[in-house]
Amino acid sequence: MILAASFLIGDSEGFSPSIYTDKTGHPTIGYGYNVSVYSYESKRITKPQAYELLTDILKENHKALLSYGWYKNLDAMRRMVILDLSYNLGLSGLFKFKQFIKAIENKNYALAVERLQKSPYSNQVRKRASRNMEILKLGVAKNIVRKNTR
């Protein structure tokens, strides 16, 4: 689960060995690692270090999300989307999507997609959001191309 989600996120985020400012104005490094939220001492990072940071956050988020029945009852592909959202938005950001979560809880994936589509998230990361909405709706992704993330 964590490995597959990390590939999706690595593909979406891309890799940067040095700190840059993302689309929302946050200082970021590695695979979209927000240094204003999580501490990181250096101004440079290697791919293995960045991958470790990414997977550590995913493991932590996955563990926290398993306490919610709506997440625990999802199939693996849809769980990956939720993990991607939790990485991109943070857990607190994800939990603000109350109507989206309610639709997921009710297994109304078309409505969940609609809720996500109407959110600022969808405009900020269009390609990524489009892929995530496809997976939510169908339970599969048609066009996932894995780039080398290590």
Task: Enumerate the predicted regions with their spans.
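Generic secondary-structure boundary/loop-capping signal
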Residues: 17, 26, 68-71
